[in-house]
Amino acid sequence: MQKIRKGDKVIVLSGKDKGCSGEVIKVNPKENRAFVRGVNMIKRHQRQTQNQEAGIISKEAPIHLSNLAIADPKDGKPTRVGFRVNADGNKVRFAKRSGELING
């Protein structure tokens, strides 16, 4: 089970976008990297195709998972993630800072 998943609200801990927050768009567990909406933007030169016109586009670059922390559902501050088993027998994630369950 992954600690950071698609749809999670995360905070960047280091790098040029330190302190910024956003939503995880995509996670690549084999490379330990994630794409976060609006964070770590890069410019790419786009060649013209039938569907798209040429120009310079901005898109997200991947960030290493060690540079991200989940935002605590209670106060929005960075927290570590723990796992526990519910009474139903389901394994769920919780914020170690507040003890709140993390959605998903």
Swiss-Prot record:
Coiled coil: none annotated. GO terms for molecular function: rRNA binding; structural constituent of ribosome. InterPro entries: KOW (IPR005824), Rib_uL2_dom2 (IPR014722), Ribosomal_uL24 (IPR003256), Ribosomal_uL24_CS (IPR005825), Ribosomal_uL24_KOW (IPR041988), Translation_prot_SH3-like_sf (IPR008991). GO terms for cellular component: ribonucleoprotein complex; ribosome. GO terms for biological process: translation. Keywords: Ribonucleoprotein, Ribosomal protein, RNA-binding, rRNA-binding. The keyword Ribosomal protein applies. SUPFAM superfamilies: Translation proteins SH3-like domain. Belongs to the universal ribosomal protein uL24 family. PANTHER family: MITOCHONDRIAL RIBOSOMAL PROTEIN L24. One of two assembly initiator proteins, it binds directly to the 5'-end of the 23S rRNA, where it nucleates assembly of the 50S subunit. One of the proteins that surrounds the polypeptide exit tunnel on the outside of the subunit. HAMAP family: Ribosomal_uL24_B. Part of the 50S ribosomal subunit. This is Large ribosomal subunit protein uL24. It comes from Bartonella henselae (strain ATCC 49882 / DSM 28221 / CCUG 30454 / Houston 1).
